[in-house]
């Protein structure tokens, strides 16, 4: 069994959001009729996507070809729209979540959902989270690595974490809104450098902000193998010990003590990195994730895990399926 925790999907179409809300900044999908579409932001091409980004049948064909049993579906992060008016973001979230629920209902043994929330308005986010879990049946939601000016330690977000604990709703944290200009403008740096840095900042903000202390039952998984955190946790821990005046303002506990308290996906593209990741984060806390259907993802899901000679069959099964089931609170028999 292979369960992919990190995949992205869009509706085939949605209303013209600029017309709907009266201002720009929104993403639209422009189809060309050849199994390809342009994601446009204010008329400029953000990304070109193929039909596997919106067509469940195309997705299922590729899942069957690569032996993926289940995909956890989440929106493309550019759709988060935390910058917009909260009620408008809620409207978009509901549109995305309803479409996601319809896709899952058509193939309930192949797909599970991670909803999206208007995180810039925590009171609205809490209500939509409850709807995602109670009405739509999602085991979790996807949130950004920061919410506008808030890092994930912001007290304004604590009601969202409290509700996630209450509902047993898992949180998948995905980097987004990286610096795109200046020194980061060339060489795909926002994706190659910015994303790992964003994820590391998200992990550190939750640790140093005391989020895991205040919400010990919170289940969180960070994308892209936790960014650079697994490799730099020694530096982070040492800095915490040397400068508690700066690092321990909100939580006196050394960051190393939280290893094993959260999950990451497996998307690191390198056997040495995956070995380090499982050693640092724990073999019970790393989950197969591919970033399907995008080119920076793992193109053959689970191939890196399978290639690891030092992993026994039990460990490989945990990484490919068992840890995902644990994180999502689901049973293997639901998908067999």
Swiss-Prot record:
Chain's role: Converts alpha-amino-beta-carboxymuconate-epsilon-semialdehyde (ACMS) to alpha-aminomuconate semialdehyde (AMS). ACMS can be converted non-enzymatically to quinolate (QA), a key precursor of NAD, and a potent endogenous excitotoxin of neuronal cells which is implicated in the pathogenesis of various neurodegenerative disorders. In the presence of ACMSD, ACMS is converted to AMS, a benign catabolite. ACMSD ultimately controls the metabolic fate of tryptophan catabolism along the kynurenine pathway.
Source domain of life: Eukaryota
PANTHER family linked to this entry: 2-AMINO-3-CARBOXYLMUCONATE-6-SEMIALDEHYDE DECARBOXYLASE, 2-AMINO-3-CARBOXYMUCONATE-6-SEMIALDEHYDE DECARBOXYLASE
Keywords, ordered alphabetically: Decarboxylase, Lyase, Metal-binding, Zinc
Gene3D superfamilies: Metal-dependent hydrolases
Any one annotated GO CC term: cytosol
One BP annotation, GO: secondary metabolic process
Stored SUPFAM superfamilies: Metallo-dependent hydrolases (SSF51556)
One Pfam assignment: Amidohydro_2
Binding partners and assembly: Monomer.
Protein name (database record): 2-amino-3-carboxymuconate-6-semialdehyde decarboxylase
E.C. no: 4.1.1.45
GO molecular function annotation: aminocarboxymuconate-semialdehyde decarboxylase activity; hydrolase activity; zinc ion binding
Catalytic activity, as annotated: 2-amino-3-carboxymuconate 6-semialdehyde + H(+) = 2-aminomuconate 6-semialdehyde + CO2
Family stated for the protein in its record: Belongs to the metallo-dependent hydrolases superfamily. ACMSD family.
Organism: Bos taurus (Bovine)
Annotated positions binding substrate: 47
Catalytic EC class: lyase
Gene (name only): ACMSD
InterPro entries recorded: ACMSD, Amidohydro-rel, Metal_Hydrolase
Binding site for Zn(2+): 6, 8, 174, 291
Pathway named in the protein's UniProt entry: Secondary metabolite metabolism; quinolate metabolism
Keyword Lyase: yes
